[in-house]
């Protein structure tokens, strides 16, 4: 039987992709959280894979980064 990756590592990989994209756009965590109208501590927990990322939240992050959701998910799958 094929093994299935657990959600926790996927959350961490998605968070790492989001962090990388945010940094390449020159945002600090605080500035980006303000940009997308999100509390900085909550946003930081998303990047660290400590919060379960809802699709509506991912949409908000993607909009702020100006990337399609599929780009983040694809990058997280290949990490």
Where are these regions (language model features)?
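Residue-level signal for the short linker/turn that defines the boundary of a DNA-recognition helix
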Residues: 16, 26-27, 53-56
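A short, Lys/Arg-rich alpha-helix, primarily the initiator
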Residues: 2-23
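Alpha-helical residues within the helix-turn-helix
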Residues: 23, 34, 63
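Short, charged recognition helix plus adjacent turn
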Residues: 2-3, 8-9, 63, 73-79
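Residues within the helices of the helix-turn-helix
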Residues: 19, 30, 59
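Short alpha-helical DNA-recognition segment
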Residues: 26-48
């Amino acid at each position: 039987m094929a093994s299935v990756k657990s959600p926790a590592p996927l959350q961490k990989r998605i968070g790492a992709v989001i962090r990388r994209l945010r940094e390449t756009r020159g945002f600090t965590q605080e500035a980006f959280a303000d940009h997308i109208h999100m509390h900085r501590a909550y946003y930081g927990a998303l990047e660290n894979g400590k919060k379960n990322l809802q699709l509506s939240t991912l949409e908000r992050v993607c909009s702020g980064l100006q990337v399609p959701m599929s780009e983040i998910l694809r990058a997280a799958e290949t990490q």
